[in-house]
UniProtKB/Swiss-Prot annotation:
Organism of this sequence: Echis carinatus (Saw-scaled viper)
Domain Disintegrin: start-end pairs: 1-62
Name of the protein: Disintegrin schistatin-like subunit A
Molecular functions (GO terms): toxin activity
Disulfide bridge map: 5-28, 19-25, 24-49, 37-56
CC annotations in GO: extracellular region
InterPro entries: Disintegrin_CS (IPR018358), Disintegrin_dom (IPR001762), Disintegrin_dom_sf (IPR036436)
Tissue specificity annotation: Expressed by the venom gland.
Amino acid sequence: SVNPCCDPVICKPRDGEHCISGPCCNNCKFLNSGTICQRARGDGNHDYCTGITTDCPRNRYN
């Protein structure tokens, strides 16, 4: 299937888009800083998006 965020010729996000896929990417844009991207397993220390990357960095307290 064709990804609407991706320019298939150069395999990069289309002009005006931030990202193609990832846990902190939705509708071709980075999710806002502070958006939970990985729920904690009982300790309450969730992992959060940074707003500048598609990665979901691990909480430093995990």
